[in-house]
Each structure stands twice: as C-alpha cells, then as structure tokens.
Amino acid sequence: MGQLKLKDLYIGKTDGYNEFLEYGSDVCRNLFFEYPNLDISKLLDGSVYYICGDKGTGKTMLLKYVESLIADNSDTNFSQFIRFKKDVDEDQRNQLKRAALPQAPFEEIIESEIPTDTTIDCVLAWQVYLIKVTVNRLKATECGVFERNDTWSKLCSLLDAIYNDKNDTNPLKKILPKIKKGNVEITAASVAKLNLDLEWTDDSKKAVPFVNVGKKVVDLYSSLTPCENRIYVFVDELELSLKKTKKYERDITLIRDLIFAVQYMNEISKLNGYNVFLITAIRNEVYQHVKSKGLEINKPIHDFGIQIDWRQKGGNIQEHPLLKMLARRFQYSEEYHGLTPTPNIYSNYFLPE
C-alpha cells in the first residue's frame, strides 16, 4: 500500500478561486490538469475566449491558471481579473440597465425600479466599462500595449471627465459614471482641450447623452496605436439571480450583453492589431437561460468558445481525466511530504477488484 496517510492527502477546495487564494498560484499550477480537448495557446492568442461548462467543471481554475502563466512574464504581460458576482453589485447592475434606456417620459419612474426589459441594449455600457478597466490597469505602467500618444491622452482624459471620481480606490467597482435620465454630467472645462464633438443637452454644457459619450470612448479606443506587450482581462462568475424575480430578468440582459461586449472588444483588437485579450467563463445553465429567451448568443459561443465536459464514453476507466486529476493530487501530496511520487496510485493505494 502507499506510504501517504489519508490525513495528508491534499484534496483541495470546491471553488477554484478560493483554492488560489488559500494556496497560491504555485501550488495550484502543480495541481492543475489541463482539459484534454483544450489547447491553452488558443486562449493566449485570442482564438478562444469563452469558457463554458457546468458548475464545478473547473472554469475558474482554468482562468486562474492562464492568469498565472501570464504572470511569469509580468514585465511584458499584464492582467486584470473581474468577478461579476463580487465586483458588479446590485446598484451597478441596475445602473447598467438604466444607461441603455432611451430618453422617455417614464424615465424618472425607471430610476427607482429594476429595469427588466430584455430588448434593452447594454453592450455599449459594458464596452465603456471594459475599456476603463483596461486603461486603468495600463495607467500603472509607463509603457506597453498602446503608445502613450495624443489619442491615449484624450481617452484617459475623457474617461476621467465622465467618471469624475479622483478618490476611486477600486476601479472595478464603479461600472458607470453617474447617469440621470440617460445623461452623464460633464463640465465643459474638463473636456475643452480634447476637441471632441459632444452633443450637449443644455446651453450651460453640463450634460451629455451617455450613448454619445460612450461612442466617443469606443472610437478613441479603436484609434489607439498598438505596441509590444499584452494585457488579458478575465471575467468570471457570470451568475443569475433567483428565477421569477426582476433581478433574474435583469441579469439575463446584462450577461447577454456582456457576452457580446467581450466579442466586440476582441474584434476591435483583431482589426487593429491590439494585444488586448478578453476571456470569460460562462456556466451552461446561464447560457441556456439566456438562449431560452430567444437571445442570439449561440453563434459567438460556438465560434469562439470551448465546452468543458469531463464525461468519458467508453475506454479504460483509469484513463478518465478526473481520475488522472485525482492521481495528480496523490502524487503532489507525496512530494509535499518528502515521499517519492507513486507511478501507479491504483495499485499502491486501492484494493484490487
């Protein structure tokens, strides 16, 4: 029988994110077992950017593993991790829906309610947020990914003007600037030097429609000059609220449009030669619920996604990927306790059939 005692066997956490927090990237990388049908290089080069699978199939662990690979070259590769469930709170989710509402007499009522109309388009709001996250991460670097030229300066200044929060300690938390009746409050002085054609809603030039300023952000971002180095933005925990609630209907729209926003941002990167890669993990149940509403998200998922499914049809049961994963944890535990890794854990730790 094997030398390892049961109490010394490392099984791990039920959640991949918690495992990385508890044990660190080095341990988790040693334990990581690559999904057999996935070429990691396709995630790194942007060929695949949707990771789909049932709950507990290892989507978060895969994201964190890729993030750890990027960290090996932290001088040339940058990353940012967003957790939808944690970083996008209730107020921000409601505000995202309101940002997409057209100007109409009922807007003042909508402001205090949870918008549930699934025909509302929130893609632009998500794009602005993802651009802000990318820019804020790169602001911490002196160079890399984009040339620090006039267009870059304009984009940074415009984002600063519309968010107008110098004390924002966590840029992930604030999804959108303050929006009232579809308009963003901006002072003319803050954008006077940017030479942008903004559609002011009043003579005093204190407010601009979010749609107008949002498109300016996307246009400026699409006009940046790429350079060396890469940045990866990971979006995880795309989960729905409980069924039969307004929050559930709202989240369906938000997740649908976030999926499209990730696609559009990656398209901008490919068209302009940007080394900016967005990767997101999506639960199958979320995908099915969104699709059941008649929302056409199947094409981008099929074209740019990978399905994690550990089921094995036929063959040697000992070659099952999940059992190989378990064997790896036995061997890691042995190494950790100074023992020689067992070549065959089945013959050493389990009774014969």
Language-model segment annotations:
Residues 1-106:
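Walker A/P-loop-proximal flanking segment of P-loop NTPase domains
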Residues 40-84, 202-220, 307-336:
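Long, acidic, intrinsically disordered low-complexity segments
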Residues 60-232, 241:
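P-loop NTPase nucleotide-binding core
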